[in-house]
Amino acid sequence: MQLDTDYLENIKITKDKLNKISSSMCMAKWFQVSLHLPNGKTHSCFHPPARLVPLTELEQDPGALHNTKHKQVQRQKMLNGERPSECEYCWKIEDAGHLSDRHYRSAEWWAQDGWNEIKNTDTILPRYVEVNFNQACNFKCVYCSPHLSTTWEKEIKEFGPYDLSNIKHNDTQYLDMPFQSSNDDNPYVKAFWNWWPELYKTLKVFRMTGGEPLIDNNTYKILDYVIKNPNTDLELSITSNLCPPDNKIINRFIDKIKKIEQIRWWEDPNKLNKEYNNNNFVGSSCKHFSLFVSLDSVGEQAEYIRYPLDYNMLLDNVNKFLEKTLTTEICFINTFSILSIPKLKDFLQLILDLRIKFGKNTQTILEIQPPDRGEYKHPPVIIKPKQRIWFDIPMLNNPKWMSDVVIAQDKSLLAILDDSLTFMKDNVEQEDYYKTGHGFKKYEIEKLKRNIDIIKQKSLKDEELKNHVELKHFYMYFSEIDKRRKTDFIKTFPELIDFWNIAKADNGS
């Protein structure tokens, strides 16, 4: 309970620190970057649109993957107290009276050594880096697109884009598709590997996304680099669907993580071990490893959203990963759309069940003896029980016909949301949390409440709802999905039948 209170208090303190600089300051614009290397795009945090990195800038400095001229202008705006329009996601939440991701991100531990660097808007080494090396993916999630998934691209090549009255959705002619060259010839991938040794020195968080990272060789190149070049400050993570096409892949991945976890000696001439005042270190190859698992619902509804997910296989792999590794964590990412809501309470129950199964009270304090170094015998490394199950519920912005715009039109969905919020409050962490790790945290409850408030603000009047373009798109899109994939929306989502019929009638069907 105290940990949760301290977390929220830290965010409020960070808000005050940001406001002393300006009312629009955000540390993420300096110290966080998401890189989409297949099509050469970059953005700081996932809310602003990704923008192309000009090759002319990249040729001068591989660090332009983060420090583009455009981003330098946005940083200056923030220092001046202006609100960059590309950050509207946070402005919308703040204007609704809530703390936004601007506050949450700026309060993260990885940003704290950068407060003295923010006056420099030009050349910054990010501390938090997300990278997508490759669009290769064996899934075609309903809210995804061909430029992020080869399976989606294959479907569009076979059937064409989705004709939704006034738009052609997922038309590859208008998407920023990956370069039609091999990964080795991609100038952005080359620039990344040229930048990597310098970037790695100050890196605190590194996250690989996709596509599906587990089927990309760059992922294993990174893991091998970390094994050979340990970094005590590094939080390493991967976002995965955790259902690779071959079981050998999951085994290979787990074996790499087990090697990273191994306790070892090493010397780093560029870093001081403050505890012993020397350059020698003992520990695992990184601070810790987290696996982010994309999962938006449970059972058949999860399989529909993240087609062709095998839900039982995913659960098996979750358990296998947690059982075979010692210090790892899993964070489930529920991309919050209209399809997430019908089984939201069941999703939350899954979180509770896993927190019980892999809770702190099921773990023991480990004493791992490092290998001797000459005649010196190092004391055992102590590994304490930890929280291993996390989740997040970022709201989907696009496509609009799955977003908060349409969610608010179905009162039954609002009732499910309110019931789910009550469920979380009824299962809030108790005083024995330090021993168990069970229950929901206050800030997790606050995030769902925030989502609900935003959704309710989007409610349309009956006359506005009629002929609303997103209703048309909703019906047309999922009707075509069912036709192409031999699925059945109504059978899978019976909770949405009334909404479906309204959307169907709005299409004149």
Regions found by a protein language model. Give the residues of each.
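Recognition helices and adjacent regulatory flanks at domain boundaries
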Residues: 98-127, 137-139, 160
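Leucine-rich repeat
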Residues: 189-194, 220-224, 249-252
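Detector for the c-type heme attachment site
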Residues: 91-95, 144-150
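Catalytic cores of alpha/beta
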Residues: 338-354
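N-terminal pre-triad scaffold of radical SAM enzymes
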Residues: 27-44, 119-147, 204-208
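Accessory C-terminal segments flanking Radical SAM cores
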Residues: 3-108, 395-509
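Core AdoMet radical
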Residues: 126-136, 147-187, 200-216, 229-315, ...
